[in-house]
Amino acid sequence: MVFGIPASAAELDGRRERGEAMLNRITADEGRMVVESLSDISPELGDWIIEFAYGDVFSDTELSLCTRELATVSALTALGNARPQLKVHIDGALNVGCSPDAIVAVIIQMAVYSGFPSALNGVSAAREVFADRGVGVTTANSRTGER
């Protein structure tokens, strides 16, 4: 049963298979480690991450994976209290082809909606991920073109 709706084992198997493949594609080992870390306290939460978040939502093809990851980075930045998840999804955005500049741009956009502290914290998280990955951003001011 998924959200109170009876589901066949084949449907659940398909969701899990899709979810595991998508989780691996976006987050590589980090996502798997998060799910595994839940096995001793809340394995069902790990199942929901795989089957719902990645098997249903992230596997939907209406948005590109880059767009989906940028939306996720925006939301996690705006929350302001999800730094570990934000770093995983910044890394995931890079994994699916988002540019570092686009990632920073959506984080900066959140200053308007969730405040400068959340945007500053988001930029700090991005800086760490970029340093770990050895990637940089274009430092030009997009309004003036100055470097």
Label each region the model flagged.
Residues 3-66, 95, 120-147:
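Acidic, glycine/proline-rich low-complexity segments that act as flexible tails and inter-domain linkers
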Residues 47-50, 80-86:
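Short acidic alpha-helix initiation/capping motifs at coil-to-helix transition points
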